[in-house]
Amino acid sequence: MTNQLPIESISVTRIAAKGGFDEHLPQETSFLFLEQFFDKSKNKIKEVILSEEGDEEQIITYSYDNDGNLISEKHHFLFDEIEENTAFKYENNLLVEKKKEFSYGSIETTVFSYNIHKLPTSIKVLDEDGIEEESEIFEYEGKNLIHFLKQNALVGKDTEIWFRYDEKNRVIEEKRWSHNDLKTLTTYYDYTNDEDEPNIKIKNDKGAVVEAHKKELNEKKQLVKHEIQTVNNGLKTFITSYEYNELGKITFLETINQSGILERSVIANYDERGLLTSEIKSEYEVAIGNINTFTLKYEYTFYQ
């Protein structure tokens, strides 16, 4: 890969394909879908513009402190003229508060607490009156392994999660209990075939498998096949296949269901620098009972 100048901006153009949700558009109709602008000094995104059929819908701007920490994020929804401003507060480079203010008056504050190892022990979401709406409580095994996580939410949707590890500190079991349905699901991770892509089985409280993930890797340790089976409302199978280029970038993927019907596919192209230049995406849309296909083209400008 050749040396690359810092990226100044990325523009994404969406080319509508005839059929699906775009059937009312001509075959070659295209519009600017997304623009990203980068801060050269911090190598981070400073502005994002989202558009729909050529009309700007949302502008997002970001600002950072001297350490590169995000300190503000502003969303401007042009159609509704609504603004959403979020301010981030840090102590010793740890995020301790995130305050989100909406132009219609609502305020939401998220506060973070940490232990002596700088790991989060609690995350709480408060409304404008300081009343807790949601929270996450973390307990650890040793210095850095999450042993227990409790997620509290309104309307009885609390969730409790326990984790178990092997001698290599890999998660081998995750038990999740939901107050919403009073059921327990246990996820088992099997690292026999690969350290980074374990096979997975999820069992209900009766010990029956309700979901399973089986993965295949090539000699380069790249994921080439991922099979998912679920038994919710009948047995369903989804098999996703992957292909890569010499840079290790995914150039093709497709997901086929148990009936052999395409659920989604992506064909990706890259330049000699490894930058994504185009994607052809196809997705099965249940609402229309048809495949919706479109192309995304990526263009870059660079700081000199």
Regions found by a protein language model. Give the residues of each.
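Buried hydrophobic residues that stabilize the cores of well-folded domains
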Residues: 1-304
